C-alpha cells in the first residue's frame, strides 16, 4: 500500500486543478488568441506562471482507489492490476470474465 502522504498529495493536486481550471483555461485562451496585442498575451503568460504548479492537471497521477498504487492502474475501473484481478476473480465486477480462447 502506498504511503498515506503520497495519496493525500495526489488528492490535493486534484482539488487544486479543479479550483484553478476555469482561470487556467481563460488564460490559455488569451495566450493563444492571435488578435490580441503582444503585451496582453505576455501579461496573461505571466499570470499563468503565477498559478500554483500543482494546479496543472499534467502533474496528476492516477492511483488505485484501493491500494494507492501509482502504476498499472486501469482507467476504466480506477483499480490497480492486482486488485482488479482479485475483484474480477471473485465475480464482483459485472461482465468481467477470465479470457479463454
Curated annotation (Swiss-Prot):
GO MF, any single term: rRNA binding
Pfam families recorded: Ribosomal_S14
GO BP annotations listed: translation
SUPFAM superfamilies on file: Glucocorticoid receptor-like (DNA-binding domain)
Keyword Glycosyltransferase among UniProt keywords: no
UniProt GO cellular component terms: cytoplasm; small ribosomal subunit
Superkingdom of this protein's organism: Bacteria
Keyword tags: Ribonucleoprotein, Ribosomal protein, RNA-binding, rRNA-binding
InterPro entries for this protein: Ribosomal_uS14, Ribosomal_uS14_bac/plastid
Keyword field contains GTP-binding: no
Protein family (similarity comment): Belongs to the universal ribosomal protein uS14 family.
Record note on quaternary structure: Part of the 30S ribosomal subunit. Contacts proteins S3 and S10.
Function description: Binds 16S rRNA, required for the assembly of 30S particles and may also be responsible for determining the conformation of the 16S rRNA at the A site.
PANTHER family named in the record: 30S RIBOSOMAL PROTEIN S14, SMALL RIBOSOMAL SUBUNIT PROTEIN US14M
Name recorded for this polypeptide: Small ribosomal subunit protein uS14
Amino acid at each position: 500500500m502506498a504511503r498515506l502522504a503520497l495519496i493525500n498529495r495526489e488528492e490535493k493536486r486534484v482539488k487544486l486543478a479543479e479550483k484553478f481550471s476555469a482561470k487556467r483555461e481563460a488564460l490559455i485562451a488569451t495566450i493563444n488568441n492571435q488578435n490580441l496585442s503582444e503585451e496582453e498575451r505576455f501579461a496573461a503568460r505571466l499570470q499563468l506562471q503565477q498559478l500554483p504548479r500543482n494546479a496543472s492537471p499534467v502533474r496528476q497521477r492516477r492511483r488505485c482507489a484501493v491500494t494507492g498504487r501509482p502504476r498499472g492502474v486501469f482507467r476504466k475501473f480506477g483499480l490497480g492490476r492486482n486488485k482488479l484481478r482479485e475483484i474480477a476473480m471473485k465475480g464482483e465486477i459485472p461482465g468481467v470474465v477470465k479470457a479463454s480462447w
